[in-house]
Amino acid sequence: MKKIIMTGGGTAGHVTPNLALVPELKKLGYEIKYIGSIEGIERKIIEKEGIEYFPISSGKLRRYFDLKNFSDPFKVLKGVFQAKKIIKREKPDIVFSKGGFVTVPVVIAAHLNKIPVIAHESDITPGLANKLATPYCTRVCVTFPESVKHIKGDKAVLTGTPIRRELLEGNKLEGIKLCGFKDNKPILLIIGGSLGSKIINEIVRKNLDNILSKFNIIHICGKSNLDENLENRKGYAQFEYVNEELPDLMKASDLVISRAGANVIYELLALKKPNLLIPLSKKSSRGDQILNAASFEKSGYSLVLKEEELEDKTLIKKLNYLYENRNVYINNMSKSKMDNGVKNITELIKKYTK
């Protein structure tokens, strides 16, 4: 039996694409193992899938000054030795890396063990982890056509992003039942990313009366961000984080407000959900979400509201515009030729398996 080690972590966006590949890889006869961080979000998600998980030391990679920049390289080095030992023992035929700081030691360790590595970059420009890992990769899968020029060494392959099959098979009635909605108002789903978004949470709750006059709200607000005062608010259902329930909640929604991570926006495209994107600003990111959002806005798939322009009036104005023009966005998304990347990526994995 062929064996693959997968890696990726830090946020759900570095894990869920791996899960999308798992059923197809199993169908192709691969035994799957996973290397991730000790305390990252990926550990709980992967172990829940029944996949053997190997935790390693990992240091966060930062583009800004921090005292931990002096200690974290030693954590990365420790992670390389740990990953090298795991890879030597497990003898995988190939490694698949989805990005995130934990992947750098794994990719380097695979290279040292002469194991081929396929990486995947979701955003238009590569994150720091994938930039550092690219020299040790065999091929780098990309999601946007614009990304090819940003990958060094002629290693880029345009594959699209992998989307979990179950996400496309949600049940609308189950989603509505889960939220306890009793009327027929259109449903607005708000997603702030797996860690939540303080600024989106605050402005939505500040304008709750206004929004609830037109919509029922599903609010995925992130860990420790539930508001106890709103627990029994009619038409408002809040969740810290959802996994199995997400397909049903997505199916139930008519509009979506979201950050602009590549994974989630491609999921919205696949589901043809009219969406308002609020990308992370350059103050708190490297600007990748701004580029992602601009690409989708240009294609007519999304309406965009910059974080710097996020105010009560602009939010309500954009939301009303999106609802009034929802069919235009649905029609534009219906014309998209973007494929689910599962088949393209698994074919590449097959090709480079030792």
From Swiss-Prot:
Q: Provide the residue positions that the database annotates as binding UDP-N-acetyl-alpha-D-glucosamine.
A: 11-13, 164, 194, 289
Q: What class of enzyme is it?
A: transferase
Pfam families found in the cross-reference section: Glyco_tran_28_C, Glyco_transf_28
Q: Is Transferase set as a keyword in this record?
A: yes
Which reactions fall under this protein's catalytic activity?
A: di-trans,octa-cis-undecaprenyl diphospho-N-acetyl-alpha-D-muramoyl-L-alanyl-D-glutamyl-meso-2,6-diaminopimeloyl-D-alanyl-D-alanine + UDP-N-acetyl-alpha-D-glucosamine = di-trans,octa-cis-undecaprenyl diphospho-[N-acetyl-alpha-D-glucosaminyl-(1->4)]-N-acetyl-alpha-D-muramoyl-L-alanyl-D-glutamyl-meso-2,6-diaminopimeloyl-D-alanyl-D-alanine + UDP + H(+)
> Which InterPro entries would you find in this protein's record?
GlcNAc_MurG, Glyco_trans_28_C, GlycoTrans_28_N
Task: Give the EC number(s) listed in the UniProt record.
Answer: 2.4.1.227
Q: Where in the cell is it found?
A: Cell membrane
The UniProt entry, under Gene3D superfamilies, shows:
Glycogen Phosphorylase B
Q: Which organism is it from?
A: Clostridium botulinum (strain Hall / ATCC 3502 / NCTC 13319 / Type A)
Topology with respect to the bilayer: Peripheral membrane protein
Tell me, in a sentence or two, what this protein's role is.
Cell wall formation. Catalyzes the transfer of a GlcNAc subunit on undecaprenyl-pyrophosphoryl-MurNAc-pentapeptide (lipid intermediate I) to form undecaprenyl-pyrophosphoryl-MurNAc-(pentapeptide)GlcNAc (lipid intermediate II).
- Keyword field contains Transport: no
Q: Which UniProt keywords are present, listed alphabetically?
A: Cell cycle, Cell division, Cell membrane, Cell shape, Cell wall biogenesis/degradation, Glycosyltransferase, Membrane, Peptidoglycan synthesis, Transferase
Citing just one GO molecular function, the answer is: UDP-N-acetyl-D-glucosamine:N-acetylmuramoyl-L-alanyl-D-glutamyl-meso-2,6-diaminopimelyl-D-alanyl-D-alanine-diphosphoundecaprenol 4-beta-N-acetylglucosaminlytransferase activity
Tell me which family the UniProt entry assigns to this protein: Belongs to the glycosyltransferase 28 family. MurG subfamily.
In which pathway is this protein known to take part? Cell wall biogenesis; peptidoglycan biosynthesis
Name recorded for this polypeptide: UDP-N-acetylglucosamine--N-acetylmuramyl-(pentapeptide) pyrophosphoryl-undecaprenol N-acetylglucosamine transferase
A single GO BP: peptidoglycan biosynthetic process
Classify the main location. membrane
For this record, the Gene Ontology CC terms, alphabetical, are: plasma membrane
